[in-house]
């Protein structure tokens, strides 16, 4: 109905029907092809509210003694007791939160989100030396890579390049792939899982 209205804006009756009967599933990646711009704005507004609450909870969690001792700095998920789970920079999910902040900044161009993205991104810088994971690609590319894409600042680029140098140490020329996991060596000789594909983007970009 909305697509018909776009073709003929005079048919406001179609727009009224669309608004009355629409069912939006944000999990449907094709949904954004035909939803109204207002709906995208509303989705980002909702995301901003969630991220602001997450940042508030994260700031509180970072002050807890156990998290400070174990250098847990980035929010990841909710624990069973309802508390916020914060993680070490080496956790494979560490780049998702700062990456989400950069995505919101890219859409809103609001300096508030830029500053929050900068702060949360640099919290995981040390991961650029972490050779124990194949997930370094999307850990650092979603955060520092997105930061460089949006700002052009050399400092972000340098981190991504070092991350790529670290990740390529997991490459085996005989297998022609980076190694996925280091554990369970008694079961797997050289594990390569499909997630590897998400980590190659940073390597291709770096070359």
Predicted regions mapped to residue ranges:
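Glycan-recognition and catalytic cores of secretory/periplasmic carbohydrate-active enzymes
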Residues: 1-207
């Amino acid at each position: 109905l909305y697509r018909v209205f776009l073709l003929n804006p005079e048919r406001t009756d179609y727009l009224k029907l669309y608004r009355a009967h629409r069912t939006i599933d944000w999990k449907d990646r094709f949904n954004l092809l035909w939803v109204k711009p207002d709906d995208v704005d509303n989705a980002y507004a909702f995301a901003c509210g969630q991220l602001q609450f997450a940042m508030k909870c994260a700031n509180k969690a970072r002050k807890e003694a156990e998290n400070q001792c174990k250098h847990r700095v980035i929010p990841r998920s909710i624990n069973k007791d309802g508390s916020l789970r914060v993680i070490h920079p080496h956790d494979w999910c560490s780049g998702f939160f700062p990456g989400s902040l950069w995505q919101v900044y890219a859409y809103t161009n609001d300096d508030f989100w830029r500053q929050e993205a900068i702060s949360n991104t640099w919290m995981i810088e040390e991961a650029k030396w972490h050779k124990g994971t194949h997930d370094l690609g999307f850990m650092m590319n979603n955060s520092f890579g997105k930061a460089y894409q949006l700002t052009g600042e050399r400092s972000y680029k340098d981190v991504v390049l070092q991350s790529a140098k670290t990740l390529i140490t997991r490459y085996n020329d005989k297998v022609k792939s980076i190694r996925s996991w280091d554990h369970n060596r008694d079961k797997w000789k050289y594990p390569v899982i499909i997630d590897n594909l998400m980590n190659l983007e940073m390597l291709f970009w770096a070359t």
